C-alpha cells in the first residue's frame, strides 16, 4: 500500500533553475535514482536545482520551548533487539528527528551533515499540507463544502472522468477514476502523464471511471496534483502564497520554505515537494494537533476539520483527507525516502523525521519507525507518571 507513494513528480527534467556541475547532473535524472551522495546534497537544495516559489519565514517565530522531559536514557526493543535513537539514525540513514510533547521540545538531533537551518524535501508530506489548506479555504469561504463537486471550482472537469467527483472524493483518494501507479511499468499513468499541470488536467479528464465515487481507494498521485489545481482556482491565488498567509506567518514558522513548481513562474504541485526545515515540519504537526488554532479562540481551520481529516473514509479505514491513519488514533503525513510528521492527539505528541532511505519505500523501515514512535510515547508517559521509580 504505502510503497506506492508520490513519485510522479520526480521524473522532472525541464524544471532546472540553477546548477553547478553536481546539481546539473542531478537535475538530468529522476530524484528516484539519485545516489546517496546526491540525496544528501540535493534534498536540502531543491530550491537551487528546480523552480520553486518561496514561502517567507514568519515575522514572529513560535519558540519551541525545551521540556524538562528528555530522551537521553531512552532505549527500545525492535525485532527482539535493544535499540537506541543512534541505532535508528544509523540503520535508516536518518538526517533529523524532533519530538514535541505537550507542545514542548523533548528531543532534537541531526546527522548526515543536516542541521536545523537547512530545508529538506517533503515528497508526499505536502499532500497533508494541501489538506489543511483546503480547510483554510472552507473557513475563508472560498469553498462551501468538501461535498461540492470539484468542477464547481475547476469547470474544465465538468466533462469527463471527474464530472461527478466531489472534493471529498479527491481528498480521500476515492474518485473511482482509473489510474495506474506502477512505477516499474513505463506505460503506467504515473510514468507517462504530463508534467505541466494544465496538460495533466486534460489528461486526467480523459481517463476512464471504474467505480462510483467514494467507494474504492486508489492511491493516485496525479489526482493530488489535480487537487492543487482545484484549490488554486477556488482561492484565486497560488498555494505557496496562501500557505504563507494562513499557516506560515500566523503560526510562527521559523525559516523560509520553498514549494516546487511545474515550470518557471508556474504552479505548485499539490502532491509533492514542499521544502522546509525539520523544526517547521514539527510546527506543522503542532498546528494540526492544535486544530489550526493560532491563538486562543482564533483559528484558521473549521472547528472539526482535523477531526474529519483524521477520520477513516468509507473507501479505506486507514486513510483520511491526505493523512494516513494509525490504529491507536494517531495520524501521519508520509513521504517517500523516509519523511514523516506523526501527530498523536491523545498523547499530545508530534514527531518529525527527515531521512534519505536507500529505496523510495521500505516496509521494514516503516515498521521500525512506527516502533520508535510508539516506544517514545510510552517512555515519555512513564516519565510523566513516574512509573519507572
For the regions a language model picked out, list residue spans one by one.
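N-terminal leader/targeting segments and the immediately adjacent pre-domain N-terminus
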Residues: 17-115, 143, 198, 371, ...
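Active-site helix/loop module of the DD-peptidase/beta-lactamase fold
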Residues: 121, 140-178, 206, 233-271
Amino acid at each position: 500500500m504505502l510503497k506506492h507513494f508520490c513519485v510522479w513528480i520526480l521524473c522532472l527534467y525541464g524544471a532546472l533553475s540553477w546548477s553547478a556541475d553536481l546539481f546539473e547532473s542531478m537535475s538530468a535524472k529522476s530524484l528516484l535514482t539519485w545516489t546517496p551522495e546526491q540525496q544528501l546534497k540535493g534534498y536540502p537544495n531543491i530550491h537551487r536545482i528546480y523552480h520553486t516559489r518561496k514561502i517567507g519565514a514568519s515575522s514572529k517565530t513560535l519558540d519551541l520551548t525545551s521540556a524538562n522531559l528528555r530522551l537521553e536514557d531512552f532505549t527500545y526493543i525492535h525485532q527482539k533487539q535493544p535499540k537506541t535513537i543512534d541505532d535508528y539514525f544509523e540503520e535508516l540513514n536518518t538526517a533529523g528527528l524532533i519530538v514535541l510533547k505537550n507542545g514542548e521540545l523533548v528531543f532534537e538531533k541531526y546527522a548526515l551533515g543536516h542541521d536545523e537551518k537547512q530545508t529538506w524535501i517533503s515528497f508526499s508530506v505536502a499532500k497533508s499540507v494541501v489538506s489543511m489548506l483546503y480547510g483554510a479555504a472552507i473557513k475563508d469561504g472560498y469553498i462551501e463544502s468538501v461535498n461540492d463537486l470539484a468542477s464547481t471550482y475547476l469547470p474544465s472537469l465538468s466533462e469527463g472522468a471527474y464530472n461527478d467527483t466531489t472534493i471529498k472524493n479527491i481528498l480521500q483518494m476515492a474518485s473511482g477514476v482509473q489510474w495506474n501507479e506502477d512505477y516499474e511499468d513505463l506505460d503506467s499513468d504515473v510514468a507517462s502523464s504530463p508534467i505541466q499541470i494544465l496538460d495533466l488536467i486534460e489528461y486526467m479528464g480523459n481517463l476512464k471511471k471504474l467505480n462510483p465515487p467514494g467507494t474504492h481507494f486508489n492511491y493516485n498521485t496525479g489526482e493530488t496534483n489535480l487537487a492543487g489545481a482545484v484549490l488554486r482556482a477556488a482561492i484565486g491565488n497560488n498555494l505557496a502564497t496562501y500557505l504563507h498567509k494562513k499557516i506560515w506567518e500566523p503560526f510562527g514558522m521559523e525559516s523560509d520554505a520553498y514549494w516546487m513548481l511545474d515550470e518557471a513562474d508556474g504552479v505548485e504541485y499539490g502532491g509533492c515537494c514542499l521544502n522546509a526545515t525539520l523544526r517547521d515540519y514539527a510546527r506543522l504537526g503542532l498546528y494540526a494537533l492544535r486544530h489550526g488554532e493560532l491563538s486562543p479562540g482564533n483559528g484558521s481551520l473549521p472547528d472539526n476539520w482535523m477531526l474529519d481529516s483524521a477520520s477513516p473514509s468509507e473507501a479505506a479505514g486507514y486513510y483520511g483527507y491526505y493523512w494516513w491513519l494509525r490504529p491507536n488514533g494517531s495520524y501521519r503525513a508520509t513521504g517517500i525516502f523516509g519523511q514523516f510528521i506523526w501527530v498523536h492527539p491523545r498523547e499530545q505528541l508530534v514527531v518529525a523525521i527527515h531521512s534519505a532511505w536507500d529505496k523510495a519505500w521500505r516496509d521494514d523501515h516503516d515498521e521500525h519507525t512506527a516502533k520508535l514512535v510508539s516506544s517514545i510515547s510510552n517512555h515519555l508517559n512513564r516519565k510523566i507518571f513516574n512509573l519507572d521509580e
